[in-house]
């Protein structure tokens, strides 16, 4: 992960820890205290007394627990929904991408999505495998092709909305697009995936999971809504 990506995810954690403040307020506050361009290294040097002295709100309630979350985010100790895990001696057997604006709820439209949260699954369960962003730099490819290539190692994509042409594009990349009901959390959908994988897989999914003998074919699980076939 580049420094730019590391900075982005730390800042996202900070924005979520300080919902009473606008993102621009938080950036200006930290930039003022650091005295330099914000980098992961500069964020980690900031102290709570230093930040408290210039806190940009007279109405936001800063409890010890909230300060603890802020300082942890500055130092790179991100909350569980933003913390990549590398469990020893476990190999991903299925990867699912979630299009989300916050890493908590499946609330992204694929054609507008900029953040993708990749979860890996095996017989023991799932874990946050990677965090990916739609690139900000100019690119030659069509936007949804860029998104498809960003998650092309995944077998499933969960989003709130997706258009027909975009769904067809994903299927050409051997990614199955799935629409989640409004308000569905990533955690709830991961639990549904675990339940599915503990039983028998639908043929269209089992076909893409070569070398897995524990997961067998079955009818399609009603936990999921298939966008296109």
From Swiss-Prot:
Q: Which UniProt keywords apply?
A: Nitrogen fixation
Q: Which InterPro entries match?
A: Di-Nase_FeMo-co_biosynth, DiNase_FeMo-co_biosyn_sf, NifX-like
Statement: the UniProt record of this protein carries the keyword DNA repair: no
Similarity annotation: Belongs to the NifX/NifY family.
Record keyword Acyltransferase present: no
What biological-process terms (Gene Ontology) are attached? nitrogen fixation
Organism source for this protein?
Klebsiella pneumoniae
Please report the name of this protein according to its UniProt entry: Protein NifY
Q: What is the lineage of its organism?
A: Bacteria, Pseudomonadati, Pseudomonadota, Gammaproteobacteria, Enterobacterales
Q: Which domain of life is it from?
A: Bacteria
Give disulfide pairs as residue numbers. none
Q: Which Pfam families match?
A: Nitro_FeMo-Co
């Amino acid at each position: 992960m580049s420094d730019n990506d590391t900075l982005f995810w730390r800042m996202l954690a900070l924005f979520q820890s300080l919902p009473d403040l606008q993102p621009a307020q938080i950036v200006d506050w930290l930039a003022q205290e650091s005295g330099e361009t914000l980098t992961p290294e500069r964020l980690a040097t900031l102290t709570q007394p230093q930040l408290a002295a210039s806190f940009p709100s007279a109405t936001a309630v800063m409890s010890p627990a909230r300060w603890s979350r802020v300082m942890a985010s500055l130092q790179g100790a991100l909350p569980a929904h933003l913390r990549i895990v590398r469990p020893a001696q476990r190999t991903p057997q299925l990867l699912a991408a979630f299009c989300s604006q916050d890493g908590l709820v499946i609330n992204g439209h694929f054609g507008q999505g900029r953040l993708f949260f990749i979860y890996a699954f095996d017989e023991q369960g799932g874990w946050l495998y990677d965090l990916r962003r739609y690139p900000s730099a100019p690119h030659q490819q069509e936007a949804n092709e860029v998104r498809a290539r960003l998650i092309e190692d995944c077998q499933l994509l969960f989003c709130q909305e997706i258009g027909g042409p975009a769904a067809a594009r994903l299927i050409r990349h051997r990614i199955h697009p799935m629409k989640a009901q409004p308000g569905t959390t990533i955690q709830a959908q991961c639990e549904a995936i675990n339940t599915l994988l503990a039983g028998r897989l639908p043929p269209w999914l089992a076909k893409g999971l070569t070398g897995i003998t524990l997961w067998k074919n079955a009818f399609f699980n009603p936990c999921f809504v298939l966008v296109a076939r």
